[in-house]
Amino acid sequence: MYSVEDLLISHGYKLSRDPPASREDNPKGRQAARTGTRAGQGLQNGHEDGPAALAHRKTSAGKGHVSDSESRRSTPRGHGEPQSTSASRTSEAGFCNQPPSAWSSHPPTGNDQAYRRRGRQEARSQKPREHENLEARGMAQAHSLPVHVREGPWEVGGRSEHVMKKPVWEEELRMSGPAKWQNVSLESWNQPRKLGRQMSDGDGERLFQDLYPFIQGEHVLNSQNKGKSRSLPRVLSPESLSCTEIPIPLNERHSPKMPPYPPTCAPNLDSTRNSEKSGCSAPFPRPKFGRPLKPPSYSSHQQSRGGADSSDSQDSQQMDAYVPRHELCLSDPGLEPPVYVPPPSYRSPPQNIPNPYLEDTVPINVCGGHSQQQSPTEKAGASGQPPSGPPGTGNEYGVSPRLPQGLPAHPRPVTAYDGFVQYIPFDDPRLRHFKLAQPQGFCEDIKLDDKSYNSSPVTAQEPAHGGMQPDGAIWNPQSLIPPSGDERGLVLADSSPRWLWGQPPGDGENSGLPNQRDRCVARGQWPDVRGSQHGHTGRQVSSPYSQGESTCETQTKLKKFQTGTRTKKSSKKKMNETIFCLVSIPVKSESHLPDRDMDNNDLKPSADQKNGSDKSPALQEQSLLSMSSTDLELQALTGSMGGRTEFQKQDLGEPEEDRQTNDLSFIHLTKHRELKHSGSWPGHRYRDQQTQTSFSEEPQSSQLLPGAKLGGPSRAALSPKCSDPAASEAQTHTAFPTGDHKQRPSARNLKGHRSLSPSSNSAFSRTSLSVDQAPTPKAGRSQPCVDVHGLGAHPGPKREVVKGEPTGPCNSKQLFGQFLLKPVSRRPWDLISQLESFNKELQEEEESSSSSSSSSSSSEESEAEPQQENRAHCRQEDVGFRGNSPEMRVEPQPRMWVPESPVCRSGRGESKSESWSEELQPGHPRAWPPSPGRFRVEEGGGAPFCSADGSTSAEKRHLEVSNGMDELAGSPFPVTRMSSRSSDAKPLPASYPAEPREPQESPKITSAFSSVKPSEAVPRKFDSGGERGAGLPLSLSNKNRGLSAPDLRSVGLTPGQEQGASELEGSLGEASTIEIPPGESLQARAARILGIEVAVESLLPGIRRAGQNQPAEPDASACTPESPQEELLSRPAPADVPRVSTDAFYGRRKCGWTKSPLFVGDRDSARRAPQAFEHSDVDGVVTSTDPVPEPEPSPLESKFFEQKDVETKPPFRSTLFHFVERTPSVAGSEKRLRSPSKVIESLQEKLASPPRRADPDRLMRMKEVSSVSRMRVLSFRNADSQEDAEELKATTRGQAGLPGGLVSPGSGDRAQRLGHSLSVSKDSISREEKEHPAAQKEKSMDQDFWCPDSYDPSRVERV
């Protein structure tokens, strides 16, 4: 094939020089020696050694040329000690960077051992970073060691050159590294390849594969390495071509980059960096060749290490990592001779067409390292693809290179093309560890591509990407940041992790720590050396480095999405898994185009950034485009909700398509790309960057929160568009909910959303408050969580965003919840989104009033829940993604749940449970899922449902209280969080009392709802979990049932605290009632619970019936939207009804979600629940059921029911019993048939009757959408007809369980149904009782199991 000379050339060695030849010889000998030394490592030797050896050999060649090379050669492995000394800079710059590339391509192969060894050595110096990178990259250590080993020399001797080289290399990394590795690889290398080898990328890849054995394999390393002097002539041919192109660039670090890329580095890049491109095409051969490629990865690793070590080192490392990949050899020559020295000239000899941009970008970049890197990349790519320059370069090879390297703009397409292949491998690391950014790196590369894509192309394509251009500094920085900072630490691996995990604290997560740290460190340090060149510094430099973490967060969010995107591109399903983690954030960013844009901008710097402004409208539109007609309708209805929900859906559900466009906007990747490119993203993306940075754990929000807790301020600082993140994002995010968002986000923004707001749009901010509530402390990251989907929202924020999207008021919250949920089941979520839009609208006011407290709590929760949120988000996303699989969902849920629980407790309990709950519930879909009830909902899509549900505040709180109580029966945590959520006044006490009662309710509600919940909590979590995925559409149905169950639960919960029949009856769904004194008037209670004035009519049984009618459980879809809407309208207004409705809605969502799973659980639980309901309702005490969960609740329940009968709402109880008693007489089947339409009618009446502030038009439209969704759900249900029947059963059960409120006016239908259910229930009540303990145990087990899951950060990250 090609001799080592070729490899050297490709690596950037100027073989034309004699020293490079001898260098080649020396490095080859050295590499051969190293290979021999590491011969035992086999491929690892070949691969790991190959790139490392090449890096060393080329390093020596580049730096020491013969002397260093020979010295190194003398030291066969030398590994970085001699090499690092002499050729440390070169090796670090070029080969150390290249080996990381190689490692990127084959992290598990030789990389592992090699980097292990190297990492051991390297770890000494930069153990944390190294470890992080290793963790993030699984192969970073190999790079690390060489990099670090060389870092000493590099940093010391090569630091000057690094500084000089770094800008070029960095630019090359940005452009070349990301684009260069793909495009430079494609074009730069193609140029040499085409010029010298005339080989296409595929050919080049094959060449790599063929060559790799020679170059990196024992053949080249041993035979060719030593035997052959790397025939300079052969190398010279490509080198000449490359050098010809690069001679000046080499001077400017471009030619080194270019030639190295073309001959070896480019192939390496293609091989490794191109792993994105060729992905698994040449895993081993490529890894072999990836050896040289490894250096980029190594550079990334080094960057992450270097960021810690020193800005310069990191810059040089990053640049080296990327640029040196290509220009290691040339770089070495550059280092050796003055050729490389002139960075400015480097710009001048731009063989890339985007050079002008790059040049501009380079100038833009202070160090120009990043910009120059981009420029070189673009130059190289432009040289190869002159037209590709700004758009093409940024886009085409940007994607390809950016994917591999840092080119953000173009990697997306190329990434999709090439990255998919390799993304899976990287995805695996990425999936297992978000911060293992290799796959995420690629994912991030895509995102970075998008980011860097816009960034790098912004540098390179600043003209091309106007939208990005506005963020040029930010864009460039972001793109530069991801490639430079992210790629530096883990361009491939770290980059993504850094963005994805950058959220924790930049490198808060160990996984992404290297990147994040690198990024943060690099960010902090890079700004010095490469503040401008560093994308991060460039852009984050724009935004305070204090927000560096935010930027990191942004990157983190990007990373997360990138992970998802990368995964999506490589493995869409994998992406889905990742997406769910990402989904939360994408929801906001994508759903809330502005927010998400901010976050997504963060995530998809370029595409998203451009989308930034578009994203909300255009992205939503695009989201609608991708959405089904109903989804579109819903989106139109809810404004951004549909889009955000779509984002969620697409993010979680349609990761594949999205993946191409925006890693962050998985679903909307393509759409988002267009939108992203529209230019809204510059600010938003940056805003989201901060948000997104913590998006995994929602540190972004948190980080943003510090500076940008005001919604826009920090974000504004971050980006212009972010200036009014809450209002602007909310508004932009959801034109529809803009007003609401503005209202709500204003308060919320400032309080809880201030961080979220900055993080994402107001919708998210609203939702982010909810979502960010957990992440609010990590508000910056929260929206990152939420909008960047807040990725943090990812757990909750995204959900919230989605939730918020349906309605302006609801948008924020709902968007998040929805986003998360959407992926699981779009229809129910759509409906829920609309319903939540209503709820949000209604709750918006409530939240407006409680926004401050809510924000406060949101902040609190955010703080408490940053990781939890992330986990919850991941979990939620997992629920969304894995919601399809019960286990996954169950596992994710619990993980989220436990984390959420404390958050919920702290934030939600503290904040007005209601407003906070509302917010959090959307955002706390994550928290909710953590809550067993939440989990269920989330599992079944209920959490997002809950989130999406505007009523989530009361309802979710109720459900959280009830569900939480249900789960509390299984686990105290849920109670806490239920109490937090459910209790305005009865924070934990109520919850805990509710907990005993919940156990009782677990029998009663659990028998009915919790029976479905505890009994079915397990089935739902497991059985239902499985069904939930399938039954997500049924979640509306379940939602109906959830209404019953929620009401029941509210009853149970309410009784838990208040144990007052009034609560059970009056506010079945009003968990708050528990805390409320029984004497408190319904209206007062409603006002207190809802935090808004409630019309008395709303509180009346009729209104409750609206809430109950929402239980048109068979009509979960239509009913749910309307019921929830109506419920929202009526329920938010009346504390009691809203409470009941909300709880019922949440429960319905929950139960609806559980419903489909409940169909599993309903099958066991439907009887159980009706029986339990009968027991609780007919018997007035969940005696039979009660004993199952906990005897002590039985008294409570007994008392509760007695109170229900006697104490507080005798009328309700009377009605309840009437309905319960009457139910049997009513034709259950007829009622069932009629319940959907009837419920819809009821809801329509209700919605129209007390105009709960919901737009009548909107309500009508929502009803329409609901009908469509219901049809869809029914279609789903047709497949699940049994589930449907059981759903009705569950509805009946729910009615029986929630007789008071549910059986109210609308209870007739429900009561009839309930009667049917009750009759069935009586039959199976004994069975239910018998089953219930097991179910309860199951639930407890589930909770216990979930708890660990919810706390399992590894899993969250992994997912």
UniProtKB/Swiss-Prot annotation:
Q: Which cysteines are joined by disulfide bonds?
A: none
**Residue ranges, annotated region (Disordered):** 1-147, 249-411, 454-554, 591-813, 840-1076, 1105-1141, 1157-1207, 1225-1260, 1276-1359
Query: What spans are recorded as compositionally biased (Pro residues)?
Result: 335-353
Point out residues bearing the modification Phosphoserine.
S1044, S1050, S1194, S1281
Task: Provide the alphabetized UniProt keywords.
Answer: Cell adhesion, Cell junction, Phosphoprotein
User: Where are stretches of biased composition, namely Low complexity?
Assistant: 302-321, 849-859
Q: Where is the composition biased (Basic and acidic residues)?
A: 15-28, 120-135, 591-613, 868-880, 1324-1342
Q: Which Pfam families match?
A: JCAD (PF15351)
Tell me where in or outside the cell this protein is found: Cell junction, Adherens junction
Gene Ontology cellular-component annotations: adherens junction; perinuclear region of cytoplasm; ruffle membrane
Mark out the compositionally biased spans (Polar residues). 82-91, 98-112, 539-554, 619-632, 689-704, 756-773, 1003-1013
| DNA-binding found in the keyword field | no
User: What is the superkingdom listed in this entry's lineage?
Assistant: Eukaryota
InterPro entries reported in the protein's UniProt record: JCAD (IPR028221)
Whether rRNA processing counts among this entry's keywords is no
Its name, as the record gives it, is: Junctional cadherin 5-associated protein
Q: Which organism is it from?
A: Homo sapiens
